[in-house]
């Protein structure tokens, strides 16, 4: 009953299982592509925070498999897809997996080696930074992210896919036309990280919001993605019934292999069994 209830309440969860996606988030990337056409001309792509792999599935189906099935395709012409996550992920055809930290320079060097020294045409990420719970600090950190993106891309847009619930306070930043500042050197980032990592480095940073006022204040356009006549992620839909009037719920395509919450679930299950054991003992004569 529980599975059928969720299938009814979450149409994208149900459609993901029916279409073979590992998670409903696959539709978010598909709807972003419908609006921005981000896959056009892409030969090298990186998927950050990839597990359990629904976005990597989209990349494989949209980029790798069509090229592989083309009669004129050559191995050297096939798109290269690299997926990165701290957690292990089940294999996906055409996707190179790297288990590592996306903030580590060595991980970036590993990706570039897979690209034979080339740079990525597209980087996608369905991950979010941890929040501190201190709203002023979180807002400052997010403003720093927006500033960094505006410095490196000429077009920055907030996109809200239709498969993203209205009740979910999330949006995706779509950045186009990579154009780094004049004189920018990638090694500058390494020096900056080394400075911030030093005991006194943080003391040199201006964490006030005053510099964001006046001419420095930036407004980012917000755009809804997806067919307005498509499925509504906040609405319940009737379940498709078979000839005998029954409904069979499908299992998830590929559950996470080693999710970070696995230990918590095991402890909860063990605690529940312990409580049931105590209740049984108390009822015995």
PLM region descriptions:
Residues 59-80, 153-165:
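Conserved S-adenosyl-L-methionine
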Residues 1-44, 55-61, 65:
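Class I SAM-dependent methyltransferase Rossmann-like catalytic core
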Residues 29, 49, 97, 123, ...:
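Residue-level signature of catalytic and energy-coupling elements of molecular machines
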Residues 115-148, 152-153:
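Mobile active-site "lid"/loop adjacent to the S-adenosyl-L-methionine
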Residues 74-80, 84-130:
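S-adenosyl-L-methionine
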Residues 46-53, 86:
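Class I SAM-dependent methyltransferase "Motif I" SAM/SAH-binding loop
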Residues 2-23, 35, 172-285:
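SAM/dcSAM-binding transferase cores
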